[in-house]
């Protein structure tokens, strides 16, 4: 009965001690290797485990993984790894990862594998404890202080248990009281001893305005038979001891409380506490089995050692007076289910291209067919991180089509596998990264910009090419000789006839009164507007709408010549034309390309200002299409052209004498005589400011033509009229008038209603009668053949020079080209216009009258030098 009561009180005391130490009790901790241990298998032939030890314990002790099979324990060899595969290291430690491979093929659904860790050597300690010599009384409790006047009363209590059972009595204990300021250390604290359960503290013991702290502990009195140590209250003083194994636990102490408990504590190097766990084991007697003390309490320590505590029950101190206590390494482990911890081998990844798309293909390795699994694919740009990659979770497939990728970009992809359904595990390792580069494709924006640029460039090229081609064409066209470029025949020769150049003839010369005066007056105000309505080119002299029938071949008998000349007086006495009569359109040269040509009915075209003769043996007909390329000489004609420079170089011109028979109604007959050849006399009248050549009448019924030193570019062929010439013979040039009959060119009287005179035409070539040209070759005594007509120079009237002759009647006339202008053979662009002396007044009264009138007005007959042709026409342009 007494023993049962003692056991009951012992258990109550242990419960009370446990309540007092409750705030320090903690559960048994798992070590870092056990926390990080994870094992997975392929469920075929191996198990892979991953765990980590702390870096601090690495130099003190090595831990070994143990694999417990059904019939044996296998030590597993592990190697260092770069990282933990499936777990994380605790934040308070620095881990050293390890990886272990365990060959194993006996897998089944009921497997529950057990793993543990063992240090590389035995670790432990042992102590013999006599109870009477290891007594530590319990600490005081229920401590409180209260003011009492100017003193402070500190009170406490101690539970000594049943006096019948307990070895400890109030006579065996005393109390030690320590006090100090709050900021002071306990080593500097003041203390006092008392055997009472209270103490009165005087004010002189304290400093004013300070906070103090006090503590009490129980001590064994000096007269007690027990020995031991005081109760806990303050930390122990630490000092350095002799060198030793720091991984070994030390300072194992056990104290019997004198009642029913044995309190033990030990210290462990703090750096090893993360890797190794220790436990307290004891034997009540040497023959008793070893038991484990629990629970183990860890005291927080600021030093390099960590203190652990554990209390042992002492139910029968008398029966078991000596305990054997030891601290050993605790073996810890856990169970892992194999079919829930499967990790497969990583797949093998490849990539293929299908036209414009890309596909990923992979193959798995060593996967049982009955284990269902799934795949996870990640792909990204090579420059990006895997955190920004795109992830696709697929079923049990072995390929995946990638979406549209950016061109000319490097991509990376990887794949892994994981078991699902009845089996479980974790993802396998990622496969090797597969890298490829997509093909380069021109962006759509670039294509649009290039097309726009090409179109714009093409338009610019076409534009500038067109402009350049047009300019080149114009330059090329300007180099082609063309009569239309010449100002000689533009606007009817308006530029060659200044308004005041003919005023002297119209107002001062009595021989020009009447129709001729009106004719000259109209020259100053003549209008060329009618040229715009003409169907022929402005260079055409003859009106294409009204031409006359060409007369028959000229009769060389004197009668024919007389008949043609009988009409001249009629023309001279003709009155003015009524104003109601329509004015004849101003004719002009006809041209087409580089050729000049008059209507077919004329040997040379008429110039503006000359009237056609009355109809002689012909009627008006519609205009025949004139040759635009040729001017025909009269059939069978022997007319020749001689340059004036050559003619004038032979001597001075003879005076022109005209027979009085020219003024009668009868036609003057040309009597062939054995005299020197008759030459044509040419006269030139030049104005003061603008040189003007007086026209020479061709004697034809269709009018006459004016000429200058040059014509526009081309190869014109002048055509002589087929009708009889109405010219009279005059004196030969350069011969005395007494030795040869004179020829005087004479124009028919010009009606008042006829058009005004046009600009000067060809000037430096004259026509020689056949008799003149043949006289040089005729033998003496044989007269020259009679001439039908010959040009006669009549002063005061326009003169005409017959067109140049060709080697045959219809041959071409070759001109000399200088720049854009052509000149007659033998003349340059700066040739001076030749002229002759005025005719003798005794031979031609009209010429004499004109000379007198001109002499009064002081019009010199000496010619002024003409400007070069090119400069002349440039001056007309500007």
From Swiss-Prot:
Residues 23-440 are extracellular. Residues 554-570 have a biased composition (Polar residues). It is a single-pass type I membrane protein. Keywords: Disulfide bond, Glycoprotein, Membrane, Phosphoprotein, Receptor, Repeat, Signal, Transmembrane, Transmembrane helix. Residues 139-244, 343-438 form the Fibronectin type-III domain. Residues 671-689 have a biased composition (Basic and acidic residues). A motif (WSXWS motif) lies at residues 427-431. The modification Phosphoserine is found at residues 752, 754. It is found in: Membrane. The chain crosses the membrane at residues 441-462. Heterodimer of an alpha and a beta subunit. Belongs to the type I cytokine receptor family. Type 4 subfamily. In mouse, there are two classes of high-affinity IL3 receptors. One contains this IL3-specific beta subunit and the other contains the beta subunit also shared by high-affinity IL5 and GM-CSF receptors. The WSXWS motif appears to be necessary for proper protein folding and thereby efficient intracellular transport and cell-surface receptor binding. This is Interleukin-3 receptor class 2 subunit beta. It comes from Mus musculus.
């Amino acid at each position: 009965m007494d023993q049962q009561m003692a056991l009951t009180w012992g258990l109550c005391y242990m419960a009370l001690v446990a309540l007092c130490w409750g705030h320090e009790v903690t559960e048994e901790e798992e070590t870092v290797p056990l926390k990080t241990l994870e094992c997975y298998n392929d469920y075929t032939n191996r198990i892979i485990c991953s765990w980590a030890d702390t870096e601090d314990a690495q130099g003190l002790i090595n831990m070994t993984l143990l694999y417990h099979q059904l019939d044996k324990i296998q030590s597993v060899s592990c190697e260092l790894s770069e990282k933990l595969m499936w777990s994380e290291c605790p934040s308070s430690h620095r881990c050293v990862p390890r990886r272990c491979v365990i060959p194993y093929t006996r897998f089944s659904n009921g497997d529950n594998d057990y793993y543990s860790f063992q240090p590389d050597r035995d670790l432990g300690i042992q102590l013999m404890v006599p109870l009477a010599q290891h007594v530590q009384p319990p600490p005081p409790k229920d401590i409180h202080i209260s003011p009492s006047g100017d003193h402070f009363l500190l009170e406490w209590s101690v539970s000594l248990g049943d006096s019948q059972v307990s070895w400890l009595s109030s006579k065996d204990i005393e109390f030690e009281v320590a006090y100090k300021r709050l900021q002071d250390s306990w080593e500097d604290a003041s203390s006092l001893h008392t055997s009472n359960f209270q103490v009165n503290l005087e004010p002189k013991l304290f400093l004013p305005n300070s906070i103090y702290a006090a503590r009490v502990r129980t001590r064994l009195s000096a007269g007690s038979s027990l020995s031991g140590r005081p109760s806990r209250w303050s930390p122990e003083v630490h000092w350095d001891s002799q060198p030793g194994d720091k991984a070994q636990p030390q300072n194992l102490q056990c104290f019997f409380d004198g009642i029913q408990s044995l309190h033990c504590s030990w210290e462990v190097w703090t750096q090893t506490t993360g890797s190794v766990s220790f436990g307290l084991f004891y034997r009540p007697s040497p023959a008793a089995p070893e038991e484990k003390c629990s629970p183990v309490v860890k005291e927080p320590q600021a030093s390099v050692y960590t203190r652990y505590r554990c209390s042992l029950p002492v139910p029968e101190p008398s029966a078991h007076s000596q305990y054997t206590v030891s601290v050993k390494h605790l073996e810890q482990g856990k169970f892992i289910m194999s079919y829930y911890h499967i990790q497969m081998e990583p797949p093998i990844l490849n990539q293929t291209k299908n036209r414009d798309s890309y596909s990923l293909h992979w193959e798995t390795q060593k996967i049982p067919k009955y284990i269902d699994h799934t795949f996870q694919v990640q792909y990204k740009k090579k420059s990006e991180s895997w955190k920004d990659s795109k992830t696709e979770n697929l079923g049990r497939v072995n390929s995946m089509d990638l979406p549209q990728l950016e061109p000319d970009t490097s991509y990376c992809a990887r794949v892994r596998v994981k078991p699902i359904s009845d089996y479980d595990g974790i993802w396998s390792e990622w496969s090797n990264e597969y890298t490829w580069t997509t093909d380069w494709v021109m962006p759509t924006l670039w294509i649009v910009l290039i097309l726009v640029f090409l179109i714009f460039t093409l338009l610019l090229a076409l534009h500038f090419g067109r402009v350049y081609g047009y300019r080149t064409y114009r330059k090329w066209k300007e180099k082609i000789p063309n009569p239309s470029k010449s100002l000689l025949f533009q606007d009817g020769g308006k530029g060659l006839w200044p308004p005041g150049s003919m005023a002297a003839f119209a107002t001062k010369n009595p021989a020009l009164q009447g129709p001729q005066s009106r004719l000259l007056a109209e020259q100053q105000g003549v209008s060329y507007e009618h040229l715009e309505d003409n169907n022929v080119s402005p260079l055409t002299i003859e009106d294409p709408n009204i031409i006359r029938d060409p007369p028959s071949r000229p009769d060389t008998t004197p009668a024919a010549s007389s008949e043609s000349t009988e009409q001249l007086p009629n023309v001279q006495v003709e009155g003015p034309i009524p104003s109601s009569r329509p004015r004849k359109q101003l004719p002009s040269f006809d041209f087409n390309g580089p050729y000049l040509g008059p209507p077919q009915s004329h040997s040379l075209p008429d110039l503006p200002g000359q009237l056609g003769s009355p109809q002689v043996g012909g009627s008006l007909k519609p205009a025949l299409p004139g040759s635009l390329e040729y001017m025909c000489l009269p059939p069978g004609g022997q007319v020749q052209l001689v340059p004036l420079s050559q003619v004038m170089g032979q001597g001075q011109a003879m005076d022109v004498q005209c027979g009085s028979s020219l003024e009668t109604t009868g036609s003057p007959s040309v009597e062939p005589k054995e005299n020197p050849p008759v030459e044509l006399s040419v006269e030139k009248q030049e104005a003061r400011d603008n040189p003007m050549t007086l026209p020479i009448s061709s004697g034809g019924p269709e009018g006459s033509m004016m000429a200058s030193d040059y014509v526009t570019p081309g190869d014109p062929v002048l055509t002589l009229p087929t009708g009889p010439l109405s010219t009279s013979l005059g004196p030969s040039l350069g011969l005395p008038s007494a030795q040869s009959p004179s020829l005087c060119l004479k124009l028919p009287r010009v009606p008042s209603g006829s058009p005004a005179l046009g600009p000067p035409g060809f000037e430096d070539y004259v026509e020689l009668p056949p008799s003149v040209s043949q006289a040089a070759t005729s033998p003496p005594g044989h007269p020259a053949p009679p001439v039908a007509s010959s040009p006669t120079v009549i002063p005061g009237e326009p003169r005409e020079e017959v067109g140049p002759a060709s080697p045959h009647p219809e041959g071409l006339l070759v001109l000399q080209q200088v720049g854009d202008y052509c000149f007659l053979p033998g003349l340059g662009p700066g040739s001076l216009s030749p002229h002759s002396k005025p005719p003798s007044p005794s031979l031609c009264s009209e010429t004499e009258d004109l000379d007198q009138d001109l002499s009064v007005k002081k019009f010199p007959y000496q010619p002024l030098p003409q400007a070069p042709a090119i400069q002349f026409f440039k001056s007309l342009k500007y």
